[in-house]
Curated annotation (Swiss-Prot):
Keywords of the record: Cytoplasm, Cytoskeleton
Signal peptide interval: none
Organism: Pyricularia oryzae (strain 70-15 / ATCC MYA-4617 / FGSC 8958)
Entries under PANTHER family matching the protein: MITOTIC-SPINDLE ORGANIZING PROTEIN 1
Subunit: Part of the gamma-tubulin complex.
Keyword Cytoplasm carried by entry: yes
Protein name in the entry: Mitotic-spindle organizing protein 1
GO biological process: gamma-tubulin complex localization; microtubule nucleation by interphase microtubule organizing center; mitotic spindle assembly
Family, similarity comment: Belongs to the MOZART1 family.
Predominant cellular place of this UniProt entry's protein: cytoplasm
Length: 80
């Protein structure tokens, strides 16, 4: 059982260190997302491909947020 706890502690420490690096580099990845990315890479996903997907999802998220804000602004001006 100690071995399992040691492995969990080591994994948590690794995530903490990678989260610190992520924060310094302004990657905006929380610990949970970072853990998922690490797991995907450990299971064979290409880090470069994963980075591309994360960038694309962020871009789409920003575009969707902008469209929602624009639609809300247009609806607000029509009510006046």
């Amino acid at each position: 059982m100690d071995s399992k706890r040691e492995k969990q502690a080591a994994a948590q420490n690794a995530v903490d260190i990678l989260h610190e690096i992520s924060t310094i580099l302004n990657c905006h990845l929380d610990r949970r997302t970072l853990s998922i990315c690490i797991s995907m890479i450990e299971n064979g996903v290409s880090p470069e491909a994963l980075a591309s997907v994360v960038k694309e999802l962020r871009k789409q998220g920003q575009e969707a947020t902008a469209q929602i804000a624009q639609a809300g602004s247009a609806a607000s001006s029509r009510r006046r």
